[in-house]
Swiss-Prot record:
Quaternary structure and partners: Homodimer.
Protein name listed in UniProt: HTH-type transcriptional repressor AcnR
Binding site for Mg(2+): 181
Alphabetical UniProt keywords: DNA-binding, Magnesium, Metal-binding, Repressor, Transcription, Transcription regulation
């Protein structure tokens, strides 16, 4: 497949990312073959790898983009509200399946894990800043360190994402989120 004349490199790069996101979400990391990536993006192998070098770099670019988007959302709304949004409109959160693939790669690929740590730190910092800001405003419980609250929320988020992405029942999850929110807030 060839790139249409007149395509700007930035547009081409973004089109590749959007198509690759769909391909990885549908087929997983291992199943996203070069042929499938070409079909999903409408771009040639040469164009894809010109922008990203290889499949892992393409996947990491998606992961970095998703971490930045999620960090922005978390800093504005908080992690529990992000989960509420996912529950209400999972289609809006197109990175859910990619996040599961990231978890799989983290478990099975030590090199990927080392590269991912930098991307995850962006999200971790956004959560910590949000928690610290709420603690300073007197909204958070003070008997538990911020790092423990962060780990707790991250653990809940991972399970929440797994449940949504695998199509498990969402019955009762809204009440679970109420419980999580209450558990990190300062008692009145």
């Amino acid at each position: 497949m060839s790139v249409a004349t007149g395509d700007k490199p930035v547009n081409s790069r973004q089109e590749i990312l959007e198509g690759a996101r769909r391909c990885f979400a549908e087929h997983g990391y291992e199943g996203a073959t070069v042929r499938r990536l070409e079909e999903a993006t409408g771009k040639s192998r040469g164009a894809i790898f010109h922008h990203f070098g290889d499949k892992e770099k393409l996947f990491l670019a998606l992961a970095r983009e998703d971490a930045a988007r999620m960090a922005e959302t978390v800093s504005e709304n908080g992690l529990v509200e992000v989960m509420r949004g996912m529950l209400e409109d999972p289609e809006r959160y197109d990175w859910l399946s990619i996040r599961l693939e990231i978890s799989k790669q983290l478990r099975t690929d030590p090199e990927f894990r080392a590269k991912w740590t930098d991307h995850q730190s962006v999200l971790d910092e956004a959560v910590r800043v949000r928690l610290a800001r709420n603690a300073d405003k007197g909204r958070m419980r003070t008997d538990v360190p911020i790092e423990v609250l962060h780990l707790y929320l991250e653990t809940v988020m991972d399970g929440f994402i797994s449940r949504l992405a695998t199509g498990a029942s969402t019955e009762g999850l809204s009440e679970v989120l109420d419980l999580v929110e209450t558990s990190v807030r300062r008692p009145d």
